[in-house]
Regions:
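Mg2+/Mn2+-dependent nuclease catalytic core
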Residues: 55-75
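Active-site metal-binding core of divalent-cation-utilizing nuclease and nuclease-like domains
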Residues: 22-43
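Short, electropositive alpha-helical surface patch
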Residues: 98-120
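Nucleic-acid nuclease catalytic cores
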Residues: 77-104
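Acidic-basic catalytic patches of nuclease active cores, encompassing PD-(D/E)XK
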Residues: 1-29
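Short, conserved beta-strand edge motifs with alternating hydrophobic and charged residues
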Residues: 27, 48-51, 89
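Charged phosphate-binding loop/patch that engages nucleotide di/tri-phosphates or the phosphate backbone
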Residues: 112-149
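Conserved catalytic cores of phosphodiester-cleaving nucleases, focusing on short active-site segments
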Residues: 38-40, 45-57
Length: 149
């Protein structure tokens, strides 16, 4: 049985974290819909991440919005309002978009989306920067401030 592209994407990011990586637990419980795909924790904090993979994101004229269910949006928004670290990480053919601060529900113009993509290595480093202390990486995260188009 072949794996889904999303599963391959998650595993690539985990490999790019190297030997020093946060504890992570893949979550998949059909009885509690809406909970993100992976929970991370380490000396620097906790992070909940919903992963999506859309190879066509950013191509054409269609605005980009992660394909989240209403339950996922509600769960993510609820935890964000509680002050927890939550993110949606969308992989595509051109790179990776990291959505934080509730912006997972805001459509992005394709040109804005592609201008703010990071590499898979940068996404892996971003996760480490949110969950581990003193790991020697200089990643501050990547959050587009405002959409201009």
């Amino acid at each position: 049985m072949s794996r889904k592209p999303e599963t391959d994407f998650i595993q690539r990011l985990h490999r790019k974290m190297g030997a020093v990586k946060p504890y992570h637990m893949k979550l998949n419980n059909p009885l509690t819909a809406g909970i993100p795909d992976v929970y991370y924790s380490g000396s620097g904090g906790e992070l909940w991440v919903e992963y999506k993979y859309d190879p066509k994101a950013g191509f054409g004229k269609k605005f980009v919005l992660p394909a989240l269910s209403p339950l996922q949006v509600a769960w993510m928004n609820g935890r964000y309002k509680e002050g927890r670290q939550v993110a949606v990480i969308l992989g595509c053919m051109q790179g990776v978009m990291i959505y934080t601060h509730g912006k997972w529900a805001v459509p992005m113009a394709p040109s804005f989306f592609t201008q703010h993509l990071v590499s898979e290595q940068e996404a892996a480093d971003w996760i480490k920067s949110r969950t581990l202390k003193d790991v020697g990486i200089g990643v501050t995260g990547h959050e587009p401030a405002a959409q201009t188009d």
